[in-house]
A protein has these predicted regions:
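Hydrophobic cores of alpha-helical transmembrane segments in multi-pass inner/ER membrane proteins
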Residues: 150-155, 187-188, 231-243, 307-322, ...
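Long, contiguous internal "core" modules enriched in hydrophobic/ aromatic residues
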Residues: 20, 73, 89, 98, ...
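Membrane-interface transmembrane-helix boundary segments in multi-pass integral membrane proteins
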Residues: 299-305, 370-390, 438-462
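Juxtamembrane membrane-water interface segments of multi-pass membrane proteins
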Residues: 1-4, 27-29, 156-177, 195-205, ...
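Transmembrane-helix bundle segments that line or gate the permeation/cavity pathway
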Residues: 26-41, 143-254, 273
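Low-complexity, proline/glycine-enriched hydrophobic segments characteristic of transmembrane helices
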Residues: 24-135
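Aromatic-anchored segments of alpha-helical transmembrane domains
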Residues: 20, 279-283, 418-429
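Hydrophobic secretory-pathway targeting helix
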Residues: 1, 5-32
């Protein structure tokens, strides 16, 4: 029986406090930034980039002048031809156009200067809004990341019951503990989304919707009331399955040796849950992630998010199992169990990469403007995290976990697991940040504080749940097979 240690409690509470203080500090700091501060910042950036660009562009501009002049002369000739034809067809307007030209020559400079000033003001306001968005987005990314770990584990747990897998029952208590975080974690994600409003979901701004016909066409789905209702339906369904599955699992431990009624109940509700899950997970990914870019959509997106949460969840199962085994609390877990967990980490990492490439390749080569813009933004403004996550989520685990022997080495699995989790945090970061903060991204105090806050909360809830039941589900009819499992 695991006992929640004081050291872990202190560590978790410290993470929560430090994370809360750091995030609140970054939130208040960002909201003290004024439009004047942003204008000064943009002027400094423009001066810095302008000086750097002048030297690099001189030679390029000289080479382009000839072709530019030719094109310009052709344009003037074309304009003159159109103007002369227009004068011939409408001689009565010629004088009027000449008069307008003289008026424009005296006022054109003033109008251009007013338009330029207006554009600068609009850009500064846009940047200010992005900077205000950053604490909200950082909190949302961290909240969603830890929630999706729990949801991924719940799916894996349901699959084990529905498949009547014989190797995994020794890991069920770890899975049940991780899924205990799902209810509070999912409610927090939904609450942040509703509270942040248009700081994360631009379609929650009525003024934007009023001027955007595409979002208006989706308003039957993308509206705040139904967003909240759907979210509560998702969370209720997931939580009910988790509650009854845990209840039947514990009841099976108290049942007579040949009484498997609770196990059969778990089998039935797990099969039903997986049907519910595959639909609601897709709709959740549309609502909670894809709708931050309301003009963009991908039919693969639900599967893509599923792969990310699935491999992240399995990785956390492996890390907690290794920790408890090192403490001498799970001696019934052997190298073959770790080997199978590492196989899933390896296999789902490859599956995630397949989905990433399929989605990217189809959209990129189709080159449809409203679709390809999603990736253009990320390649231009998020080049390092966008391509860096491929190394973290595919290349590194592929190379480290390819060898069968390495899948049995705990520290190898831990090393690969930490990299995989960091990589999938970056994946969620890449999905949320471009639409909310644009090119004003950075992994700093808001992001690190939010991760610390939810990491502390996750550890506290998960290990509290671990302490509430024996680590070995002795009543499971496959427990002997699981204990003797050897690959």
């Amino acid at each position: 029986m695991y006992k929640l240690s004081k050291r872990l409690i202190i560590t978790a509470i410290t993470l929560i406090l430090v994370g809360t203080i750091g995030w609140v500090s970054s939130y208040t700091t960002s909201h003290h930034i004024t439009i004047e501060d942003v204008e000064v910042m943009l002027a400094n950036e423009h001066a810095h980039h302008g000086n750097a660009a002048d030297h690099s562009e001189d030679s390029h501009n000289k080479a382009d002048y000839a072709s530019d002049d030719t094109a310009h002369d052709h344009g003037k000739a074309h304009a003159a031809m159109i103007h002369s034809v227009h004068k011939a067809d409408h001689p009565e307007e010629a004088g009027h156009h000449n008069e307008d030209f003289h008026k424009g020559s005296t006022h054109g400079g003033e109008n251009r200067s007013e338009e330029g000033s207006h554009q600068v003001d609009e850009h500064a306001e846009h940047v200010l809004h992005q900077m205000h968005n950053r604490p909200y987005a950082a909190l949302y990314v961290a909240a969603f990341f830890f929630m999706m770990i729990s949801l991924g584990v719940l799916a894996f747990y349901g699959i084990q019951y529905a498949a009547q897998a014989g190797w995994s029952p020794v890991l069920f208590r770890v899975m049940e503990a991780i899924t205990y975080y799902l209810l509070p974690g999912a409610l927090i994600v939904l609450a942040i989304g509703l509270w942040a409003d248009d700081h994360i979901f631009i379609w929650m701004d009525p003024e934007v919707v009023a001027h955007d016909k595409l979002i208006q066409g989706k308003s039957g789905w993308l509206n705040k009331k139904w967003f909240a209702i759907r979210g509560l339906i998702f969370i209720t369904g997931w939580s009910l399955y988790r509650y009854f599955s845990r209840k039947f699992s514990l009841a099976q431990d108290q049942a007579n040796e040949n009484d498997n009624r609770n196990f059969k109940k778990n089998f039935k509700i797990s099969a039903a849950f997986l049907v519910f899950y595959i639909y609601t997970e897709s709709m959740m990914s549309w609502d909670w992630i894809m709708s931050v870019d309301p003009h963009w959509f991908s039919t693969l997106f639900g599967w893509y998010v599923f792969a990310s949460m699935f491999v992240s969840g399995i990785t956390v199962i492996a890390l907690i199992t290794i920790y408890l085994k090192a403490k001498g609390l799970m001696d019934f877990v052997n190298d073959s169990h770790l080997h199978d967990l590492a196989k899933f980490m390896f296999g789902i990492s490859v599956f995630w990469t397949y989905l990433w490439f399929s989605q990217f390749m189809l959209i990129w080569f189709a080159n449809i403007p409203e679709e390809v813009t999603y990736f253009v933004t990320r390649i231009q403004d998020y080049n390092l995290p966008f391509f860096g996550m491929l190394i973290l989520n595919f290349i590194f685990p592929f190379l480290v976990l390819m060898n069968s022997d390495y899948k049995r080495v705990p520290w190898f699995i831990v090393m690969a697991g930490i990299v995989i989790l960091f990589g999938h945090y970056i994946d969620v970061f890449n999905m949320i940040m471009p639409a909310t903060v644009g090119d004003r991204w950075f992994i700093g105090i808001p992001e690190l504080s939010a991760v610390a806050l939810f990491l502390g909360l996750f550890l506290l809830i998960v290990f509290y749940s671990l302490s509430k039941a024996p680590l070995l589900p002795k009543g499971n009819p496959f427990i002997k097979e699981s204990e003797q499992f050897h690959y």
